[in-house]
Amino acid sequence: MVQAPMISVPLKATSEIDWVAPLKNYIRNTYGDDPERYAEECATLNRLRQDMRGAGKDSTSGRDLLYRYYGQLELLDLRFPVDEKNIKISFTWFDAFTHKPTAQYSLAFEKASIIFNISAVLSCHAAHQLRTEEAGLKTAYHSFQASAGMFTYINENFLHAPSSDLSRETVKTLISIMLAQAQEVFLEKQIADQKKNGLLAKLSSQAAALYAQAVEGVQENVTKAIFEKVWLSVVQIKLNFMNSLAQYYQALADEDANSYGVAIARLEIAQGLAKEANKMAHSFPTSVPPNSNLTSDCGHILADATKRHLATVKEKLEELNKENDMIYHQPVPAEASVAPVPKLPAAKPIPVSELYAGQDIQRITGPDLFAKIVPLAVTESASLYDEEKAKLVRAETERVETANSEMAASLDYLRLPGALQVLKGGFDQDILPDEDFRTWCVDVADHESPHRIFEYLHTEKQAISTILDKSSRQLDMEESVCEKMRSKYDAEWTQQPSSRLTTTLRTDIRRYREALEVAAKSDGQLATKLRANETELDEMRQAAQHGEIDELFQRAVRKSRKSNPNSPATVEPNLLEADFDDGGPSVVEQIQKVEDILKKLSLVKKERLQVLQDLKQKAHSDDISQILILNKKSIANYEQQLFQQELEKFRPHQNRLVQASHKQAALMRELTVTFNNLLQDKRVRADQSRYESVQRSRTSVINKYKRAYQEFLDLEAGLQSAKNWYKDMRQEAESLEKNVEAFVNNRRAEGAQLLNQIEQDRAANKSSHAALEQERLKNLMERMSMDPSPTSPKPSSGSGGRPTPAPLSFAPAAVSNTPLSAYQKSNFSTQYPASPPATQVPHNPGGQQQTPYQQYNPSSLGRIPGPASPPPNQTSFNIGPGRHPASPPPTQTSFAQSRPYSLTTYGNPSALNPQGGQPQQSQPGGYVPPGFVPPPPPPGPPPLGPQQTVHYGGNEYYAGAMGNPNIGRPGSGQQGPQGQQGGWGQPPPQQQLYQQQGGGGGDPWAGLSAWK
């Protein structure tokens, strides 16, 4: 049997476009991303459009190509605004019927054209199916409905059609045609299955109604020269044919109902409609336009179908007329009075969402090409959703923590499960400390022994005392030598008294000694604290070192119990072994029941924590960005509704947590009742005193060692502070020692120069006096001579006949060639070169702050007074306003005013600089007290000839007196510093070095080391 021809819609054609460049520009300008990262995605989208242009119109592959491109356009529209203002791409499509081109920049136009082609492909695919086979018939039935659904989507979503094929009137006509053909296909299946006549009549009536709607639209579009005229002929023929079928099958149904008169009337109507259809089919053109998608034999097929149907109707009409005339004699109603045939719809438009029902849409459309690009609006919505998730997780976490806290508090109140150990008799055998006790022991063992620290402190204190004693002796020795030289030379010894210059140094020494005394008292307090807790600390240290912490705790508890007079003296029998038979449950059974409930509670807690963990993990991995992107256009209207809908996925976890809380409450009530019954048992009450005694002993032991540990922490802090203090104090003492040595060395050098000056002055005086006496003797001899001398000098006027003595000269003849001419400068403080000794480092007294001390107070961690001393590289000593100038060190060029000095404490650096750390300003010209006249500079030594040596006996005495008063004196048998015999004829080592350098022409301090 030849199947009836079906109308299929032609496809729209389009011109080529380029997606790549516009998309890359937009990604660069709007999203600020590198467009080359999306080069492959842009090329893929471009290739999809090329493939879509060549899609086959009668296959599922062509449909899938179109739908894949359309799906990517939908996803693209959520991220990229393709229009005339943003991504400007001209889409050119040709009308499917008139072939007129239409160009727009709107992505909606592109999508509507794609959907139109999908509908056209579906209609072509349905029209070409072999409906004589069941599979082909089902495919045609589904495809016609799907085509109608796609046309319906265009009609509902694209209101302003730019071309005639997309206009609402045209699309509605196409919907009617597709639905009518789907109804016809379904009718063919029912006729082939020989269904009841009444059903077939209703299906035919519905098909006729759909064709009637199509005729109206096709007639209008033919008038507008949009559709081909052959389409109007086909729908008109099928309209009459379907109406004739409806009347025919309804007549058969009336015959079955013994309504022969009505049946005859319907057959007469069917005969007239069949004749009209056959007439139109015979007038169908033999050649059809290519754009109509109809075959050339379409007219012959329709003519044959209508002819066969007309013959069938005529035959049945003759049969019924004969039977009615002979048997039934029922009246035949008029055509106008015949009731219309009821309609039964069997076809409806399939929505786009159901087009691929039962299939993997992701497989057809492919992955989202631009999934890595998330619009800002979607990101903001995703952040809001994340906050909603966080609120939910926080609420459930708080609920779980509350439930766990309630369980812990209840068990702690009931003293479970620890109380069960007592009842089972295992408490004495396994008394274990808590983790805090173990931590205390390990911490005590990890620290350095306090005894070693005390030994270190004692050693440091002795060393500091030795340094202070040495410095004090040096100052005393220097002062003693200075005063001895003053006593020997009287007014000629013009060196300043040492007592006026060593006030600051001696004050530092005194204050350092006082600070050591205060520190010793603090050390004593620390030692007292150690002795008070030494036993407990030693026990804790040894237990941690030997891994016997548990044994220590158990011994301490047993010892505490023995020393407690209120504790039971004898061990009571084990409750599990006691024999009480009062007819009730045994203690073992009651304990077992309590343990079972505790196990159930533990499982509830474990399950609750696991559910919470699963909830957190699921919430963390939950990402609805794609859902938000798909709903981007409508998210503003129902954002909260969407969030609540998505949060429902966590509802099962929430319900499980609520159930766990209810189960815990029930188990806690059961546990309370069961455990109270156990405690009320007379066999259990007999053991209460023993349990309480153990608890008291355990608490007492923990408190004792806790107190010892706290004292240990205080002791350790005090000892560490003391170590730091003694370390800083030793540095200060060593700095003071170097300052004292520098002072003494400077005083020695100053004394040596002064001694040289005195010796030179005395030698000059002796030489002048001898010359004067010789002149006087010569004059006397001349007067006593009997021979007059013509060369006798004339007496000087105004001299009374007495010759004028030669003036005294204190300068040697060759002194003008020596570098000692620098001594003629009047400023005493600047007549020494600025070359520091080997042991002295240049120092800026105003620009360097001393290192702050560590705090040290073992008893209260407070501060204990302690002194401060200038650093070892200090080059000036502070003097008060009423003091005489001090002898400067070799590199000092000025004196600095003293600053207030107060006794400091351990770790108090501010005491060293009471003025807020501001450096003291030195006086460039040096400080000279009123009435002080510096001594005159010593003259240089006389010129030396080859192998000539000049001896100054006085220097030996001064050099020896600094170490031993007997060294260097005339007649003394002791040797000098270099092992030579002391005497007036041998210069000291410094004088030898001075002579070797040409009378001090090099460095006048070169012999300083000899005076140390």
Curated annotation (Swiss-Prot):
GO terms for cellular component: endosome. Residues 558-578, 784-812, 827-1012 are annotated as: Disordered. Residues 970-985 have a biased composition (Gly residues). Its main location: cytoplasm. Residues 844-857, 914-930 have a biased composition (Low complexity). PROSITE patterns: BRO1 (PS51180). GO terms for biological process: protein transport to vacuole involved in ubiquitin-dependent protein catabolic process via the multivesicular body sorting pathway. Keywords: Coiled coil, Cytoplasm, Endosome, Protein transport, Transport. Residues 301-330, 719-775 form a coiled coil. The keyword Ligase does not apply. Residues 931-945 have a biased composition (Pro residues). Residues 827-842, 892-913 have a biased composition (Polar residues). Gene3D superfamilies: alix/aip1 in complex with the ypdl late domain, alix/aip1 like domains. It is found in: Cytoplasm; Endosome. Residues 5-407 form the BRO1 domain. Involved in concentration and sorting of cargo proteins of the multivesicular body (MVB) for incorporation into intralumenal vesicles. Belongs to the BRO1 family. This is Vacuolar protein-sorting protein bro-1. The lineage of its organism: Eukaryota, Fungi, Dikarya, Ascomycota, Pezizomycotina. The gene is bro-1.
